[in-house]
């Protein structure tokens, strides 16, 4: 009973597979140019990356930093603020709860990205329609 391996061009960390995509997409504008939708099409259970510990944050930063173009400053992650009847709830796009936080306090834009000047370790909220590279994540099937 061999454990499932991530596809050859994906990186493995614990029970997940990760891949950094250079192309610039919006977070989720319900169009064909949409990072969350793109991730969901890459693998069953695929989403924009959720980051649930310092260790995972380090792993994702190391995946992004050597591979990102010089002119690119933000990388989408799967966190978005959703307004529901005046109550804001932050949720990862894979529906995991936000128990680990690494925010740079900013404005009230709705979608979160890793920022280059923070070494791709801190989360900043920026406009969801901006085109940015992104990281996808899915759990390895058993």
From Swiss-Prot:
Which SMART domains is this protein grouped with?
A: CLECT
Q: Which PROSITE patterns match?
A: C_TYPE_LECTIN_1, C_TYPE_LECTIN_2
Q: Superkingdom of this entry's organism?
A: Eukaryota
Q: What disulfide bonds does the UniProt entry report for this chain?
A: 6-17, 39-136, 111-128
Where does this polypeptide localize? Secreted
Q: Which organs or tissues contain this protein?
A: Expressed by the venom gland.
Q: Which UniProt keywords apply?
A: Disulfide bond, Hemostasis impairing toxin, Platelet aggregation inhibiting toxin, Secreted, Toxin
Q: Which residues form the C-type lectin domain?
A: 13-137
Q: What is its main location?
A: secreted
A molecular function (GO) term: toxin activity
- Cellular component GO terms held in the UniProt record: extracellular region
Keyword Disulfide bond recorded: yes
Assembly with partners or alone = Heterodimer of subunits alpha and beta; disulfide-linked.
Record's family?
Belongs to the snaclec family.
Q: What does this protein do?
A: Binds to platelet GPIb (subunit alpha) (GP1BA) and functions as a receptor blocker for vWF binding to GPIb. The platelet GPIb-binding site resides on the GPIB-BP subunit beta and not on the alpha subunit. At a final concentration of 104 nM totally abolishes vWF-dependent shear-induced platelet aggregation (SIPA) at a high shear stress, but had no effect on SIPA at a low shear stress.
Anything else known: Negative results: does not induce platelet aggregation or serotonin release from platelets.
Protein's name in the database: Snaclec GPIB-binding protein subunit alpha
Originating organism: Bothrops jararaca (Jararaca)
């Amino acid at each position: 009973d061999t454990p499932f391996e991530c596809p050859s061009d994906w990186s493995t960390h614990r029970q997940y597979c990760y891949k950094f995509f250079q192309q610039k997409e919006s977070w989720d504008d319900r169009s064909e140019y949409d990072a969350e939708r793109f991730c969901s099409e890459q693998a069953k259970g695929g989403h924009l990356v959720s980051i649930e510990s310092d260790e995972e944050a380090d792993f994702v930063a190391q995946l992004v930093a050597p591979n990102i173009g010089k002119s690119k400053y933000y990388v989408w992650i799967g966190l978005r603020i959703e307004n529901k009847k005046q109550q804001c709830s932050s949720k990862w796009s894979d529906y995991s709860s936000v128990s680990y936080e690494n925010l740079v306090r900013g404005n009230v834009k709705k979608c979160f990205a890793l920022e280059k000047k923070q070494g791709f370790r801190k989360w900043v909220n920026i406009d969801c329609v901006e085109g940015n590279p992104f990281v996808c994540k899915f759990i390895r099937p058993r």
